[in-house]
Design a protein with these regions (language model features):
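Short acidic-glycine loop/turn motifs at beta-strand connectors
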Residues: 46, 115-119, 131-132
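Short, structured patches in soluble enzyme cores that scaffold and shape functional sites
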Residues: 13-15, 54-58, 78, 127, ...
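Long, positively charged amphipathic alpha-helical accessory segments at protein N-termini or as interdomain linkers
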Residues: 75-103, 128-190
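A translation/RNA-centric and nucleic-acid-associated enzymatic feature enriched
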Residues: 124
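N-terminal lobe of the biotin/lipoate ligase/transferase fold
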Residues: 1-68
Length: 190
């Protein structure tokens, strides 16, 4: 589990640096960094999200050579930990829209967790890095979402309502949520 020390705008691997308003980030006290995975930006703010990375070796029973299918088990663990009745794991291909090029949570990828009642609302974002010997799954859940701040920090200001609807917030107490997640992550594959 990671806890950011400062508010940070994390650019996706293919996102141009110009997508973010650097002056607005500086005024807001938001650092800018780039990750090696994903498409759109992610706004990471201390105490407003839960960021959990899981690394498995190739010999792990959860390993799948199919990169898309490989994320389903971790999405299912998050779904079970949060609320299995209200959520589902996206089992299709990557679904993007114009907003997803700017904001990671506006798209849906294989294994990501979305609201059953609103399939455009992402609750758990997942990205993956892998080598021949291991896979690292980077996951994030929002405990609070600030769509206006996110819009303010982007060069091309997106519609705030679309941003607000793109992200589902998890209000379950963090210790309980993490304990449930660990239980589901360590359960044998079915």
């Amino acid at each position: 589990m990671f806890s950011p020390a400062r508010p940070t705008m994390v650019l996706g691997s293919s996102q141009p640096a110009e997508a973010v308003d650097h002056a607005a980030c500086e005024r807001a006290g938001v650092d800018i960094v780039r990750r090696r995975s994903g498409g759109g930006a992610v706004l990471v703010i201390p105490d407003e999200m839960i960021w959990v990375d899981v690394v498995i070796p190739r010999r792990d029973p959860h390993w799948d050579d199919d990169v898309g299918r490989a994320m389903h088990w971790i999405g299912e663990a998050w779904r079970q930990a949060i609320d299995p009745r209200a959520l589902r794991v996206h089992d299709g291909r990557l679904v993007t829209q114009a907003l997803a090029a700017q904001v990671c949570f506006a798209g849906r990828g294989p294994g990501e967790v979305i609201l059953e009642s609103s399939p455009t609302t992402k609750v758990v974002g997942i990205s993956q890095r892998r080598t021949a010997g291991w896979a690292r799954f980077q996951t994030m859940v929002h405990r609070r979402w600030q769509p206006v701040l996110m819009a303010d920090l982007l060069t091309e200001r997106p519609d705030e309502r679309q941003l607000a609807d793109a992200v589902g917030v998890v209000e379950r107490p963090e210790p309980d949520l993490l304990a449930a997640l660990v239980r589901h992550l360590t359960a044998p594959p079915t």
